[in-house]
């Protein structure tokens, strides 16, 4: 296992500033996410995954809650992420995110080169 970070002259391929955040339970990695922070304006959480045996037990909620606390402490004001249709209700109703407007998504893509994936809804939360 490892954490890789690669800077590139191509903006869409620049992985500088990416971090891996994880939640462990008794030495076992349970939930992980990739995080990229753009100064104090915005942080992006494009990928989150939980081991199958630990799904539907609040592990993602715990990871995101702790991540939000850390981001607030360093002055980050907004967290954005792409939500797949099946999990959109979790992100919005349960975790307090809101779907972004198309113009907000376009603006964010231009300013910060955030990742969005086909078939997902970009969501944001003010911290």
Which ranges hold each PLM region?
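Terminal substrate-recognition subdomain of acyl/acetyltransferases
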Residues: 1-30, 36-42, 69-127
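A short, internal acetyl-CoA/4′-phosphopantetheine-binding micro-motif in the GNAT/acyltransferase core
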Residues: 48-56
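Conserved acetyl-CoA-binding loop-helix of GNAT-fold acetyltransferases
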Residues: 56-69
């Amino acid at each position: 296992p490892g954490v890789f970070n690669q800077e590139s002259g191509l903006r869409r391929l620049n992985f500088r500033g990416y971090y891996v955040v994880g939640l462990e339970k008794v030495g076992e990695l349970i939930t992980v996410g990739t995080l990229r922070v753009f100064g104090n304006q915005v942080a992006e959480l494009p990928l989150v995954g939980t081991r199958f045996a630990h799904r539907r037990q609040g592990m993602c909620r715990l990871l995101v809650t702790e991540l939000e606390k850390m981001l607030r402490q360093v002055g980050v004001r907004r967290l954005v992420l792409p939500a797949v249709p099946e999990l959109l209700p979790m992100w919005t109703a349960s975790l307090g995110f809101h779907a972004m407007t198309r113009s907000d998504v376009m603006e964010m893509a231009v300013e910060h080169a955030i990742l969005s994936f086909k078939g997902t809804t970009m969501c944001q939360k003010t911290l």
